[in-house]
UniProtKB/Swiss-Prot annotation:
One Pfam family linked to the record: PCRF
PTM characteristics: Methylated by PrmC. Methylation increases the termination efficiency of RF1.
The protein, known as: Peptide chain release factor 1
Gene: prfA
Organism expressing this protein natively: Listeria monocytogenes serotype 4a (strain HCC23)
Phylogenetic placement of the source organism: Bacteria, Bacillati, Bacillota, Bacilli, Bacillales
Gene Ontology cellular component list: cytoplasm
Record keywords: Cytoplasm, Methylation, Protein biosynthesis
GO molecular function terms listed in the Swiss-Prot or TrEMBL record: translation release factor activity, codon specific
Family per record: Belongs to the prokaryotic/mitochondrial release factor family.
Domain of life: Bacteria
Amino acid sequence: MYDRLQAVEDRYDELNELLSDPDVVSDPKRLRDLSKEQSGITATVETYREYKNVNEQINETKELLGEKLDDEMREMAKEEFAELQKEKADLEERLKLLLVPKDPNDDKNVILEIRGAAGGDEAALFAGDLFRMYSKYAESRGWKVEIMDANPTGIGGYKEIIAMMNGNDAFSRMKYENGAHRVQRVPETESGGRIHTSTATVAILPEAEEVEIELHDKDIRTDTFASTGAGGQSVNTTMSAVRLTHIPTGIVVSMQDERSQLKNKDKAMKVLRARVYDKFEREAREEYDANRKSAVGTGDRSERIRTYNYPQNRVTDHRIGLTIQKLDQIMEGKLDEIIDALILEDQTSKLEHLNDAN
């Protein structure tokens, strides 16, 4: 571990020199990439330097205890030695976590996609409930939410809704929401009071920048059509809706939320870029995931990750066996208790894998 930490510190010093190099300063892309790399290892280097400083103090205190001291001085040195040992152990744990490979997408914005699945109108209503839950969570964290496209049912639900979430650490927290969400409740239309089970799927995609995924015009087919509202009726007579097809992957994105064809195409390109980026990234991870299945699941959108039981006011996350009797609060956007537990489980799993590799 310490060889790796020393290598990280050496790289940090090298980056400091590079960032003051006129050739680097005059190259915006390289400057940004190197600055991002340095920012990503700063906490590790600072903690490692603190660790080395504590180690030096421990050695000095050891030497002091080997000398002839009066009782009071010896007692003080012993207390200081014990405190330093505890501080060293704490720093070692922090360093282990800092060495866990960071998801390069963690600091990205999020494209959120929610779709009603099994359960008809009730599934669409639940999709709407999930979107409101995530919107309130985003508000609590100071993130901005912008609806990019929606297919409402007319009864307060959505067959599909796509939104952008902009804010610090958005992907690092929202990525654990990928998967199938199941609801158990009595629908308002149910006269017999029977509990129904419905499902909605959630996809969390990191926003991909143009420099990260290049989409060539020749690979994209663009179709335009008239926008339609709930029930299929036309909402305007102009051909403002846009459908983009990425020919190499077959990925299709339709957008009709805006009255402007140009705005719809711009939004569709953002979603298309994110979906293509996500597809390539998932394929690149397949071999790694085959060797180490994450403790918090595969991220597969068909994987059932959570159940929301309304009669019992209960939420269960099946990946980590966590049950919380606070469904009313969860649906108001108070998700941190669940997400923090998922992050801890994920970090613990990665740390165990790192220790096994060493």
